[in-house]
Amino acid sequence: MIKGLERVLENTGNSGLGELRLMLEELLGGNGAKSSLIEEEMLRSQAHSARVYRLRFAIDGRVSSMIVKLVKPQNMRRSELAAKHWLPAVGLGDHGPGLLASVTDRSGDCVWQVYEDFGDNELNCRQPDPDRVKAAIQLVVQVHTRFAGNPLLGEIRMYGRELGTHFYESTVRDAILALEACRPPEQQRPLYERLLQRLYKVRDELPARAQAFEEWGGPETLLHGDLWTTNVFVIPTSNGLHARLIDWDLSGVGPASYDVSTFLLRFAPCHRAWILDAWTEEVARAGWRMPPQQELNFMFETQELARYSNRVIWPAIGLFEDRAPWGWEELQMVDQWFEDLKPVLALEPEKSATSLV
């Protein structure tokens, strides 16, 4: 038995800890090694997303570190397929999340996953290093180009999310239905009316936005779906920089611009031009062409509006079903996002796209 294993995450209130501890003992060789838990660190713990922890163990005099993550079963399946099947199928298996094992709790409501720990090599968006950013871009472009027209897209679509224009259309429709069903108190009525009008406007713009994707969106491909820099690791090795993409929980199928827009928005506007230039050069090497920046801005805006609309749904359902007190706070935050939305790329005034927002 690994010393201290019985206390792993004992004060977190998480489900499935018994199953997690048994899996950790198997992975660490608890029957033969002299081992002990030395540290646990919470990396992420939010009510509506995965809970992530770093665990460190002393094993026969050396320190071993791993990441454990509590996820919903449907998200586990996407991450598992990305790590074990999709990425290896196109020669990118060693650029994935390093999944070691998974175990479902008795209720079937959640799954623990154990991953390799890639240390503090997360991509820095505040002070971006060009070489590391380019290594990350090279990997993402490889994913996009290798999966365009790939026969696995049908499987990816079945298990993953639809992130094209259908995502925009269905998300906006669902957000409107959920919000219309709320009965706001008088003090929240201005927010309610304002947010509804924003959603109606986004819905009415669908034909023009769908047409833009028809003309400029390019082929469907595998999308990471949550390409924040916190999910991109660039690791120094003896052979140079080695990029990895973690957290494939929200992966799916759609146009490459979905991932491009998410990635660019993590950086300050002053960095986006050179990052886009690097991206344009990389896709050109693969035989693709980046759309003109005016059209890119319009597509980026469309995808951000879809993401904002998606964030309306669960607070609105919470208000409709339970009058959840956090619901109006969440909706106020989303309303402010709509208000603050600006073009991803800064263009010359005469070259700027005419926004429909």
Where in the sequence are the language-model features?
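A cross-family kinase active-site recognition segment
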Residues: R126-R194, E220, Q332
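A glycine-centered beta->alpha junction motif in the catalytic cores
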Residues: V114-Q127, T145, G149, L177-P184, ...
